[in-house]
């Protein structure tokens, strides 16, 4: 045995000093590895739609209702199943309604507790006692553990069981106990949650989604293009902050900045009112997709703010393009192509009339230079982003739990794309003087995204990293954007829709090719035959016959459109994916009405399940990434056991 191996075994022996302890741990590890694989839940492109997100999270994409049918399908009718499901999703709110309706609330408590305990036993059966115990609320952990481990068909145990429940009811703790059971069931039906990008965008409550995820038991993120924009703003990128504000103004969602995060937009409002007071800002009128009741004066002011921050954004983008020639984006220096006298712009060999040619803050001789007032404004805005504790807390969580891509249990997860040429080869990009492509490119993007947040302000490293974060939002070789260019300026200022076209990266055609998907999987160190790519970012237009299952099941696109704006395009309100011990299941969801309707009328999101792959042999923990680590531990312990038995090491006490 080599010296290093012996040193490692000696170190291991300090934790397992005897044959008995070593053998016991091996047995424990083998037992865990033989348990069924836990359920993974995949969500993508939530876009700030908290109500629908919360419902899908609470119902486990329909898993809870299916478990109820498994146990009580012959005992309960559909109405009773819906009622029990709603109770588990929203225990406190539902019990408030039930308490007003029930004549004998104690009898209802008793029946409900019996059912919840039986259901909890069922969903806990695939876990170790230790794992279930850790998931329990402290106040009820001892009693819950007793109740979940008993066999209540035995007469002597049944009386003990009923006595416990009777005491819970008589001591007025039934509602708290029901809530504890409901939350435990919610936690146990999903072992791990993957958010495949874009918590943020036009939806009103990304902050609530982040608060929820920060308290979720096991979660990871693959950053999306809208997430990266907010991360950039929180890191100190002025252009990212300008983009965040512009999008929020465009979709009448400034409340997320002012109310949810406490970022004052008063300086922007004052600046806009002064600079654009006689400007109708016709092409900057916000989109009122939710028909929110705003006064004409409010809409007018938001339109001014919208135009003011858009112009600042275009100037800041020009600064980056000029100083980062390696980004190869000079064709996006559109302020250079404007004829300010005639109100036209020259794009790709053609002249177009500008819809709006009122540019009071642009110097035609130096169009990207901020005015003194603009400079002061953006500095105030950046101070607000930097000093917003809640936003910084959320962004830190995104950094802690997130990444550009993730390999997990044989699958590859990423939000946008892997930039490809037409022939399927990986696109290259030069970063800090060296070219990268494929997996290495995404790894470098991640390193620089992290540097943008942690590098000291004012350093060249910080500035470069922040510029890369902006590039990830808009660049042609960005794995998060996936298009040739972002035509934001043209959509505001040019009527001809020919100029609005954003050509998708060849990836989006090639991802239908099984060979290409296998190539991508192998690039990231996965088995091309067994693995899958889980992708978000582009809404699947089911109404036009598009399928989320591509390349013979190698590619699964799970952006079905949580955002209400996409419902008409997708005919859906989102896809989610489940990966349990039996295989992969894609779940499509119809639009969600409201939390209030769900609680009062026991409505749920209508979900349709499609089995993608069914395992011939049920997957066990040993087949997972965690299982491989546990197996390595078991093998090391077997070596330690052999060393004890062969006299190479002596047992301690």
UniProtKB/Swiss-Prot annotation:
Keywords: Carbohydrate metabolism, Hydrolase, Manganese. It comes from the Bacteria. One of its GO terms (molecular function) is fructose 1,6-bisphosphate 1-phosphatase activity. Pathway: Carbohydrate biosynthesis; gluconeogenesis. It catalyses: beta-D-fructose 1,6-bisphosphate + H2O = beta-D-fructose 6-phosphate + phosphate. Its EC number is 3.1.3.11. It is an enzyme of class 3 (hydrolase). Its cofactor is Mn(2+). GO terms for biological process: gluconeogenesis. Belongs to the FBPase class 3 family. This is Fructose-1,6-bisphosphatase class 3.
């Amino acid at each position: 045995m080599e010296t290093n191996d012996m040193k490692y075994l000696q170190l291991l022996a300090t934790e397992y000093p005897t044959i008995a302890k070593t053998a016991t741990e091996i047995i424990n590890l083998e037992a865990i590895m033989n348990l069924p694989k836990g359920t993974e839940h995949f969500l993508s492109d939530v876009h700030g739609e908290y109500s629908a997100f919360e419902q899908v999270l609470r119902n486990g994409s329909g898993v809870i209702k299916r478990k109820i049918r498994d146990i009580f399908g012959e005992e309960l009718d559909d109405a009773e199943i819906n009622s029990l499901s709603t109770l588990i999703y929203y225990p406190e709110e539902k019990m408030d309604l039930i308490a007003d309706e029930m004549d004998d609330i104690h009898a209802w408590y008793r029946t409900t507790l019996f059912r919840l305990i039986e259901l909890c036993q069922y969903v806990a059966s695939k876990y170790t006692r230790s794992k279930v115990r850790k998931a329990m609320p402290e106040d009820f952990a001892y009693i819950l553990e007793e109740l979940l481990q008993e066999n209540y068909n035995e007469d002597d145990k049944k009386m003990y069981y009923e006595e416990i429940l009777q005491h819970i009811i008589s001591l007025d703790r039934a509602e708290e106990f029901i809530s504890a059971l409901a939350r435990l069931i919610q936690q146990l039906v999903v072992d791990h949650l993957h958010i495949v990008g874009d918590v943020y965008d036009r939806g009103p409550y990304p902050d609530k989604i982040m608060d929820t995820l920060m308290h979720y038991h096991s979660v990871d993120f693959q950053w999306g293009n809208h997430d990266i924009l907010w991360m950039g703003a929180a890191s100190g990128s002025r252009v990212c902050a300008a983009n965040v504000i512009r999008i929020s103004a465009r979709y009448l969602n400034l409340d997320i900045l002012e109310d949810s995060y406490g970022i004052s937009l008063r300086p922007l409002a004052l600046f806009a009112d002064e600079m654009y007071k006689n400007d109708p800002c016709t092409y900057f009128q916000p989109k009122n997709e939710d028909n929110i009741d705003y006064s004409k004066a409010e809409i007018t002011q938001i339109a001014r703010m919208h135009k003011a921050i858009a112009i600042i954004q275009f100037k800041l983008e020009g600064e980056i393009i000029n100083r980062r020639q390696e980004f190869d984006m000079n064709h996006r220096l559109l302020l250079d192509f404007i004829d300010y006298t005639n109100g036209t712009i020259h794009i790709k060999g053609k002249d177009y009339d500008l819809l709006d040619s009122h540019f009071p803050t642009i110097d035609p001789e130096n169009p990207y230079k901020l005015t003194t007032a603009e400079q002061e404004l953006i500095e105030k805005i950046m101070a607000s982003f930097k000093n917003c504790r809640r936003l910084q807390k959320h962004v830190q969580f995104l950094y802690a739990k997130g990444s550009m891509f993730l390999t997990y249990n044989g699958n590859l997860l990423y939000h946008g794309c892997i930039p490809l040429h037409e022939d399927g080869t990986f696109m290259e990009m030069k970063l800090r003087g060296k070219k990268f492509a494929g997996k290495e490119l995404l790894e470098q993007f991640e390193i620089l995204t992290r540097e943008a947040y942690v590098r000291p302000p004012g350093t060249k490293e910080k500035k470069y990293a922040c510029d890369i974060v902006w590039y990830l939002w808009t660049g042609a070789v960005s794995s998060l954007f996936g298009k040739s260019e972002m035509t934001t300026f043209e959509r505001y200022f040019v009527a001809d829709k020919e100029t609005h076209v954003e050509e998708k990266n060849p990836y989006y055609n090639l991802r239908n090719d099984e060979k290409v998907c296998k190539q991508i999987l192998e690039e990231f160190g996965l088995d091309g035959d067994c693995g899958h790519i889980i992708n978000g970012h582009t809404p699947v237009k089911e109404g036009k016959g598009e399928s989320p299952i591509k390349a013979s099941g190698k590619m699964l696109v799970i952006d079905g459109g949580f955002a209400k704006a996409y419902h008409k395009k997708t005919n859906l309100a989102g896809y989610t994916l489940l990966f349990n011990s039996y295989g992969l299941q894609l779940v499509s969801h119809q639009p969600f009405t409201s939390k209030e309707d769900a609680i009062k009328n026991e409505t749920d999101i209508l979900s349709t399940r499609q089995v993608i792959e069914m395992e011939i042999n049920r997957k066990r923990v040993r087949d997972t990434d965690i299982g491989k680590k546990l197996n390595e531990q078991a093998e090391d312990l077997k070596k330690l056991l052999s060393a004890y038995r062969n006299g190479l090491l002596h047992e301690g006490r």
